[in-house]
Amino acid sequence: MQIIRLLNGKVVAEDVSPVFDMQCQVLCVGAGCAGTYAADAAARNGAKVILLENDITIGGMHILGNVRGYYYGFEGGSFEEDDQAAQEANVFYHKADQKRVFLLRRLQKSGVNLYCGYTPTALLVDGNRVRGVLAFDGEKEIVIRADVTIDATSDGFLIRMLPVEKSYGRSRGGQMAPFSVFSTFFDGEKYRMVNRDAGYIDPYDCRDFSRKTMHAHRQASNLVRERQMLNLASHTGVREGLRFQGEEMLRYEDVLLGRTPEKVLFWAYSDLDVHGHLRALDDELFQTWWVVSNLATAAIRIPVPMGAVVPKGWRGIVTAGRCLSADSYMQNAVRMVRDMFRMGECVGTAAAIAALEHEDFRNIDYSRYLEKVKRAGCYAGDESKEVGFDFPKKNRPYQPIVFDFDKTFPLLRTETPGVAIWSAFNCKSQASAADRLAVLLDETDSLCRYNAAIALGVMGDQRALPVLRELLQNRDCFYFKDCRRSNQFRSVIAVCLLGRIGEPCDIPFLSEIVFNEKEFSKEMYHTLEPDYLYYKGSDRNFLYFDMVTHGGAALVKIHHRFGLATEKLKLAFIRLLEEGKLEKRIAPRCLAEDAPREEARQFLGEMIRSTDVNGKRNEGKA
């Protein structure tokens, strides 16, 4: 056997003849949202289970990170029993303490052996099979043998030790989602929670993590001047971390286009919950959904493949939580608290079957697995909700969405054309749909004409170009109304589409938007006050930020598509970065380390890399 561990960021291995201090059938590392229910489910299904937690208590971000409310994620499963019990209890002032009590009772009842204050230090492997872990208990390193090991550390602490391909952040730029520090306060009437984006953080860089966390705490503590602060979360809210190459991969394009894997581990439920505002660097298909079709808050059932929790080529180890084999967009979606509870319960159930039957995780009796998780209620969620506008506060009824070009065509005459635009994009009869849209380009109603041009443009039809150019010449701050938040501006969408189907003659106009300081003085950028419908923050000029970033990305695309020299364009972006004027116009009241100015620098840095003939895209690799 060998032990493999990380030393200075590198995987190293050494031969050993281990003496086991503890043995179990299922070992779960991490007692957060997923790990707690994974351990409990494995024990209830007959396995001998050990649960290790690095911290002094359990609950993870749900308890220690103040993430106690629910956003999306399906109901169903064991967590509902604990929620109900905690709701009815009146023992503690702090709800998190109540929930923790019932989590501990659950583990005790199912027979899980819980060890807090244990830090995993190495993996024990035999060939391509993980046989357990080494952990430090504060005094010595102990060896634990297990038939199945579950990495429920959220950031893939164990997966990082494996020689598998790993990555983080989006494919272009490698940037991860912004982090938050959750704070609770009393505003004179109610106790409330705030979780505003606090900038970008590298969770694997100790110096960056410490510096950014302290800055975020300093910002949050300003609430003391206005309200009665109760507490700041002891855990930093990192939304995105390590991903790995698994036996299967969860891809956002498969979800958006309705492809389902043969064996589904469980069904998650969320909108494509991407934080941050630099949509100009997103993948084109994602932009089509989120920006052009204005479907930011459309919630989707997400089928997570069984193989997405299994590192490629390895046996005896799986993950539970947001560290999985997925792209950045899916990792951001499959992280809702309720879904983490349910995912943990499903993984724990499958792990117990694998351990007791001496079978690999992916080769267990799938029908038996389905029977167990469906009976427990943690597998499918509400099967009537495929895709639709859902409202987490339940203050409005669920609105199902059907993508049918003929049925949604009338929406192009309204302020809510998003479903019709995506239906046109994904229509099987592209030619006939495009011809119907082209007829609308002659409409006298500018709303209908502009909507039709956007739908035609997203299909790649250049007949949309004259109207898109007209839209931009008359650019304004009109925004679509499909969503309860994050609605997109029509002018921004037109700029985005020019990048896809525009021509060299569009370069001067786009350059004026990006590089001419007089652009910022236009009335459209100083008309709207912050609003939850499109952008609720006062930390930046949100419309100008979107126009400039999408304009810059469009310029680069046109240059590349037509094989134009990019040296002058690169120098123009370099000047913007060095002068710092752009980030000051975007966010004049922010510090350099705050999210808006940081995003402006990220944008310019990626534009410079994209125009460098010798440069390569900065894809996040771990």
Question: Predicted segment positions?
Answer:
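Structural detector for internal amphipathic alpha-helices that build alpha-solenoid repeat scaffolds
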Residues: 415-430, 435, 439-442, 447-462, ...
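Conserved N-terminal/central alpha/beta ligand/cofactor-binding core
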Residues: 2-7, 13-23, 37, 41, ...
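Short glycine/serine- and small hydrophobic-enriched flexible loop segments
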Residues: 40, 44, 346-356, 457-458, ...
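Glycine-rich Rossmann-fold phosphate-binding loop(s) that bind the pyrophosphate
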Residues: 30-33
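C-terminal domain-closing interface element
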Residues: 89-90, 383-426, 436
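Amphipathic alpha-helical scaffolding segments comprising HEAT/armadillo-like alpha-solenoid repeats
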Residues: 399-410, 429-442, 461-481, 503-536, ...
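Flavin (FAD/FMN)-binding glycine-rich loop and adjacent Rossmann-like elements that form
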Residues: 3-9, 17, 61, 85, ...
